[in-house]
């Protein structure tokens, strides 16, 4: 009975998300409540919801302050000199332009938002692509792959946040062992950028451009994309801001304090240092709070879903049925199986449907083989390079529309590179021990 009820709940939730009948926040909250009532768990729903919310509270705090932290630093222009330097270095060489596109996208992807990453990358680099005749699909693919690595693996990025919150994990436990894989993934994307750029160089050669022509259109487009006035920029504070970012990241890796506490401190310091005026502080907080609150609400809704799924024991029943069909000899490979199946699953499912609907079931099934939930969480993000090609991803639709290209053509161009990246980071995760084979 519980197995049927659990599968039905996950199916209904997935359909609601896929058909966009309701928002993810509504689906995550209403669906489990309705099915809990059907199963006769009405009296315990309140306690289950509260327990689920308590489980994800630290993840919600992490997201809130990380988004605000990076938002303030982007406003202050911390990354502007690097963007301008990239534009001046790449000149008319397709290889340098491709690598510069990847580096820029990785930098912007630190804020965890695909829309911001694509808007700034495309606006800064597209004029160069057009001027020398490079294929803009190269830029689109590299921006997508860069986003999948940086935003996909950092604990404040969308996929990792969902996995961490739904399984009630500590962000540091998730991220620190994954850091070598992330760095390897970054190196992989840069190497792929070199290959794509070399192919374009063989096609069109190196185009000689005057320096003043290189950055003119790009700088104007970049400024239009950021939509920030000069009064927000703090060029004199750039080294202090850079020191602040590096310090926060070092402390996160060392695990001295919970990341949510570190990002809270970092956000408050960044806000105070760059915008000591109270009025400007309120304006900056208001500017970024919309995106932050939306994500936090999503996390708390995930807590409701996970709390009821766990409290009613539906997840145990579903996991039991999965365990029964997996040969015991394959149990030790479960994290690898999750990593490989995440490639097709996350393409046909939205992140909400996959992480909130399927990952908890995988984690519970894996526990029967002595595999920790955190390994399943890490394994589940290996398919993100392919996921970001999906038409279900709003930022991908934005990307192809900005470049005035057809989504199908983009998918055909990018699929090879995306699959390669997913397989490479999966292999790196196995080698470095982020996911294990028992």
Curated annotation (Swiss-Prot):
Q: What keywords does the record list, in alphabetical order? A: Cell membrane, Citrate utilization, Membrane, Symport, Transmembrane, Transmembrane helix, Transport
Q: What is its main location?
A: membrane
Q: Name one GO cellular component term.
A: plasma membrane
Coiled coil ranges:
none
**Gene Ontology terms for molecular function:** citrate transmembrane transporter activity; symporter activity; transmembrane transporter activity
Q: Which domain of life is it from?
A: Bacteria
Can you tell me where the transmembrane regions are? 22-42, 59-79, 89-109, 137-157, 174-194, 237-257, 258-278, 292-312, 330-350, 356-376, 380-400, 418-438
Listed GO biological process terms: citrate metabolic process; transmembrane transport
Where is this gene product found?
Cell membrane
Membrane topology listed for this record: Multi-pass membrane protein
An example Pfam family from this entry, by short name, is: CitMHS
Which family does the record claim for this protein? Belongs to the CitM (TC 2.A.11) transporter family.
What does the function comment of this entry state? Transports the free citrate anion.
List the protein's name: Uncharacterized transporter YraO
Please name the source species.
Bacillus subtilis (strain 168)
What does the record give as the organism's lineage?
Bacteria, Bacillati, Bacillota, Bacilli, Bacillales
